[in-house]
């Protein structure tokens, strides 16, 4: 009888990726299968996030509920991972001594050894070190789950924004070697993945080492990923404006696989606040890069993160943020009321804005974004949109759902045989949080671009260009 594993995940897409890797790892080493309820599990893992307010207390509240399970089932093992574990490992050990394993984002690959150790000793294990890229060398081969997949290309962040805990919980920027990234994507493409989302806390800062010791920058990585047959869409998150350089904008001119959607967090539209946040750019510089990008991709949609009520934010400062939102025409935002993160420089600043003022500003910002999003959605009426079919509609299993390039969900009627493929859909209606449409053509009628098969790349020892096959831009393609 297989052992049962339950994983609860909070936070960003990187955490979702890490949780998937934990499940795959423990399946390959110990035969664990995932279950939907903690009550069914032999091992429970909590993958935590420290971004939101009161993240630590949320963890202890959850652990308190699971303590009751362990009281009834003494052999149950409980582990806490993620950014809160990295930041508050000693506190978790003291306040929740029943927790068996505490591990950081960079040590999740050591879970099998932790479980083996717990078979011989019941002493709690804590490992929140930063062994850089080691975890990727120890993870099992990827398993595709649908037509879209996340691939982590780097870890950590070296920007040290004053409000952010990431450099302290995930470490400084470390890029995966180029060959490793391309190999993982080729494996996923062999399993039917059509869209890849490149992940990193500061993904545009990717500087991956090649087989000959040189460095591959993010724009060149994108071009190489685009040559893999089957990968017809490329997304990436999260970006930093300082690293969103002109060579990346240039890639949008000749890499059609890059989608017409960009998530580029700006946090504030006020230069004074941006300086206090240590963001390294001005609102004008941000708008300038977006203006350049929209010259080559006029249909591109934009989303961003915003922090509301950062210490010292005045009404005029907030108005500058609203002006930026209108100027860029964002159609989606992840907006949060500021709350101090322990250990960050901003935590020492006086939190001098009332909760009600923060709530009022957040409401105004979200209303403006919603207004813009609805207008942009209505502009899509009667247009044809290429949609990657994800599966049955969540509301009507007789229909299918998929995602447009600009990240909108579309529901439509089509044969289930097109799941995992691209279809062209005419948009006929705009409803709350989604679109409706009619099937125009299936993928077999499209003639999508083919460059190199995943099998070619998997068979190649280096997966890297040689000087003889560089194009006029100095960008290479694979030699099968």
UniProtKB/Swiss-Prot annotation:
Binding locations of [4Fe-4S] cluster 1: 12, 49, 83
Cross-referenced PANTHER family: CDK5 REGULATORY SUBUNIT-ASSOCIATED PROTEIN 1, MITOCHONDRIAL TRNA METHYLTHIOTRANSFERASE CDK5RAP1
Domain Radical SAM core: 143-375
Subunit structure: Monomer.
Reaction(s) the record says it catalyses: N(6)-dimethylallyladenosine(37) in tRNA + (sulfur carrier)-SH + AH2 + 2 S-adenosyl-L-methionine = 2-methylsulfanyl-N(6)-dimethylallyladenosine(37) in tRNA + (sulfur carrier)-H + 5'-deoxyadenosine + L-methionine + A + S-adenosyl-L-homocysteine + 2 H(+)
GO function term, MF aspect, one: N6-isopentenyladenosine methylthiotransferase activity
Annotated EC: 2.8.4.3
Domain MTTase N-terminal: 3-120
Required cofactor(s): [4Fe-4S] cluster
The UniProt record lists the keyword Cell inner membrane: no
Family assignment from sequence similarity: Belongs to the methylthiotransferase family. MiaB subfamily.
Gene: miaB
Gene3D superfamilies, alphabetized: Methylthiotransferase, N-terminal domain, tm_1862 like domain
InterPro entries, alphabetized: Elp3/MiaA/NifB-like_rSAM (IPR006638), Methylthiotransferase (IPR005839), Methylthiotransferase_CS (IPR020612), Methylthiotransferase_N (IPR013848), Methylthiotransferase_N_sf (IPR038135), MiaB_methiolase (IPR006463), rSAM (IPR007197), rSAM_horseshoe (IPR023404)
Keyword Iron-sulfur belongs to the record: yes
Principal location listed in the UniProt entry: cytoplasm
Location in the cell: Cytoplasm
Domain TRAM: residue ranges: 378-441
Role: Catalyzes the methylthiolation of N6-(dimethylallyl)adenosine (i(6)A), leading to the formation of 2-methylthio-N6-(dimethylallyl)adenosine (ms(2)i(6)A) at position 37 in tRNAs that read codons beginning with uridine.
GO CC field: cytosol
Record's keyword terms, sorted: 4Fe-4S, Cytoplasm, Iron, Iron-sulfur, Metal-binding, S-adenosyl-L-methionine, Transferase, tRNA processing
Protein name: tRNA-2-methylthio-N(6)-dimethylallyladenosine synthase
Binding site for [4Fe-4S] cluster 2: 157, 161, 164
Cofactor binding mode and count: Binds 2 [4Fe-4S] clusters. One cluster is coordinated with 3 cysteines and an exchangeable S-adenosyl-L-methionine.
Organism ancestry: Bacteria, Pseudomonadati, Pseudomonadota, Gammaproteobacteria, Alteromonadales
